[in-house]
Amino acid sequence: MSQLETRTEPMVVNFGPHHPSMHGVLRLVVTLDGEDVVDCEPVIGYLHRGMEKIAENRTNVMFVPYVSRMDYAAGMFYEAIVVNAPERLAKISVPKRASYIRVLMLELNRIANHLLWLGPFLADVGAQTPFFYIFREREMIYDLWEAATGQRLINNNYFRIGGVACDLPSGWLEKCTDFCKWFGPKIDEYEKLITNNPIFRRRIEGLGAISREEAINWSLSGPMLRASGVSWDLRKVDHYECYDDFDWSISTATEGDCFARYRVRIEEMRQSLKILLQACEMIPGGPTENLEASRMLEGKGSKFAGFDYQYVAKKVAPTFKIPDGELYTRLESGKGEIGVFIQGNNDVTPWRFKIRAADLNNLQILPHILKGAKVADIMAILGSIDVIMGSVDR
């Protein structure tokens, strides 16, 4: 890309990789003309751990605990995609109840992801208070995860080929419903604090604007794409899991700037709450304690002992072989499209396991939208993209 003409002697400044606003070990080599950004070169790779090669030397069950170390704000999404790929290649069906449990975990993770984006983003532009609020809400999600999976943040190790590791514990659905009813007003609280705050709006409106055509041409996904007016969400497009059972809408904006990306993520949290409440109510078999009681009452012939009421289709043996063939599968995470290209050769480990991270693709547009911006705007624009270097570098 061509550099802008400079009025003064250009100065090269390094931001990161240890700067607190870099959202991980990202280094930006920025060329400045006074206060204006002339050029920017992101330097990545500081957190590369060879995840794809690790996947090619592990069975699926062995690899699932690794993946939440990639995007440590959205481990459930990577667990889901890592089991979805061999499932689809081997044509393994997933029980309806297991699919609902997966959706519950994914939507909780979407809210947790957006909360962890919201706090640091606002801290970057000078609003300190919400940073403490978001951890109060995330604690509730941690508690729900801990009850279901045994772990709070990462290494939940909950998704399995054909379903999930275990059924939801007694009382979990009621706690999840309580959380949803409690969290709805908290989003209103954030909006009251932030959305119409004139200082906040003047600070970020018009910053880092991306047109609809640019968003499509740069292969953006997630809130970055939808904030530019493209109504594209893989939950609606690919019809994976059981998202078609629920009534919800895609959140979009048209301005394509930092403020639009903020609004899209806030609205996505509301839509996730709608999905969670419907899933808690409609899950096949209902709460675990009711399901077990019905099975005991009706005996062996009970319909509740059928396939769709199980939490896993059939526990996959450690010797499960990934069949010959290749396949690309994708899903909508909090950051955008994450995907896995898997190539099997009838062995317990895949021959090729390529991971597509949403934030790596979204980060590529950063030099383009930083040109002409001020030094003070770098952190606001980078923060609005939502990058986690664990998944960018893998």
Curated annotation (Swiss-Prot):
NCBIfam families in alphabetical order: PRK06075.1 (NF004739), PRK07415.1 (NF005649)
Entry function: NDH-1 shuttles electrons from an unknown electron donor, via FMN and iron-sulfur (Fe-S) centers, to quinones in the respiratory and/or the photosynthetic chain. The immediate electron acceptor for the enzyme in this species is believed to be plastoquinone. Couples the redox reaction to proton translocation, and thus conserves the redox energy in a proton gradient. Cyanobacterial NDH-1 also plays a role in inorganic carbon-concentration.
Catalytic EC class: translocase
Species of the source: Prochlorococcus marinus (strain MIT 9211)
Protein name as annotated: NAD(P)H-quinone oxidoreductase subunit H
Gene Ontology BP term (one): photosynthesis, light reaction
Stored InterPro entries: NADH_Q_OxRdtase_suD (IPR001135), NADH_UbQ_OxRdtase_49kDa_CS (IPR014029), NDH1_su_D/H (IPR022885), NiFe-Hase_large (IPR029014)
Superkingdom in the source lineage: Bacteria
Localization in the cell: Cellular thylakoid membrane
Reactions the enzyme catalyzes: a plastoquinone + NADH + (n+1) H(+)(in) = a plastoquinol + NAD(+) + n H(+)(out); a plastoquinone + NADPH + (n+1) H(+)(in) = a plastoquinol + NADP(+) + n H(+)(out)
EC numbers: 7.1.1.-
GO cellular component, one term: plasma membrane-derived thylakoid membrane
GO MF entry, a single one: oxidoreductase activity, acting on NAD(P)H, quinone or similar compound as acceptor
Gene that produces this protein: ndhH
Quaternary assembly: NDH-1 can be composed of about 15 different subunits; different subcomplexes with different compositions have been identified which probably have different functions.
Family: Belongs to the complex I 49 kDa subunit family.
Record membrane topology: Peripheral membrane protein
Annotated keywords: Membrane, NAD, NADP, Plastoquinone, Quinone, Thylakoid, Translocase, Transport
